[in-house]
């Protein structure tokens, strides 16, 4: 069985994430994709994560509802500390069924793979799927070939381009603009009902790292 792991902050999860997951799953014949929201991301400043981990996890659950081939795992949230992907993957492989494992992320993130912890060891555990937009210049990944012995475990998959980003969604919320159709409807309802990403919510929901570390 082929299983994809889709990690990220999902702050918030949006239609771009859903399209990538569906198209990669279809292209590579995966049985399922497991979404793994980060708890305390090791590569981001604490202040850059806007919504608490529990809210982000519940938004992921809302986004994947109705797709039986999508699931979510809170392994990184429950860890209560920053977890690197190379730590997360072996633990997931122990607790979930699967024979072939893939890690799904954007090509721009893959181009920075040398900054990840133990990238070659990670590539021994999974095939790294670099989701690209149409027309993406694959030579932007070429610098990795001489530095990674497992470079051949990086596999680009072209996905439909949707000009949606979590940053742009948060900006629209701050500006009082609609985010309908940019995120799944269940995600939009959580954001609105909890007042996430509004200017007055930044600190009220958000001594988040202090809360999540305690």
UniProtKB/Swiss-Prot annotation:
Keywords: ATP-binding, NAD, Nucleotide-binding, Nucleotidyltransferase, Pyridine nucleotide biosynthesis, Transferase. It holds the Pfam family CTP_transf_like. GO terms for biological process: NAD biosynthetic process. Its EC number is 2.7.7.18. Pathway: Cofactor biosynthesis; NAD(+) biosynthesis; deamido-NAD(+) from nicotinate D-ribonucleotide: step 1/1. Catalyzes the reversible adenylation of nicotinate mononucleotide (NaMN) to nicotinic acid adenine dinucleotide (NaAD). PANTHER family: NICOTINATE-NUCLEOTIDE ADENYLYLTRANSFERASE-RELATED, PHOSPHOPANTETHEINE ADENYLYLTRANSFERASE. Belongs to the NadD family. This is Probable nicotinate-nucleotide adenylyltransferase. It comes from Rubrobacter xylanophilus (strain DSM 9941 / JCM 11954 / NBRC 16129 / PRD-1).
């Amino acid at each position: 069985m082929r299983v994809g792991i889709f990690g990220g902050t999902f702050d918030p999860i949006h239609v771009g994430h859903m399209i990538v997951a569906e198209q990669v799953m279809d292209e590579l014949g995966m049985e399922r994709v497991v979404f793994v929201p980060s708890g305390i991301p090791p590569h981001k400043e604490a202040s850059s994560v806007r919504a608490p981990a529990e809210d982000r996890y519940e938004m992921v659950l809302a986004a994947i509802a109705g797709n039986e081939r999508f699931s979510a795992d809170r392994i990184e949230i429950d860890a209560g500390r920053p977890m690197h992907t190379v730590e997360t993957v072996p633990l997931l492989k122990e607790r979930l069924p699967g024979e072939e494992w893939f890690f799904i992320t954007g090509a721009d993130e893959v181009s920075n793979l040398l900054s990840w912890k133990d990238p070659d060891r990670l590539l021994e555990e999974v095939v790294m799927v670099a989701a690209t937009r149409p027309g993406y210049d694959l030579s932007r990944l070429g610098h990795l070939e001489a530095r990674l012995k497992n470079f051949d475990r990086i596999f680009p998959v072209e996905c439909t381009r949707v000009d949606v980003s979590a940053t742009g969604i948060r900006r629209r919320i701050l500006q009082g603009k609609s985010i309908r159709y940019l995120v799944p409807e269940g995600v939009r309802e959580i954001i609105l009902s909890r007042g996430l990403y509004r200017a007055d919510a930044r600190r009220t929901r958000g001594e988040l790292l202090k809360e999540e570390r305690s």
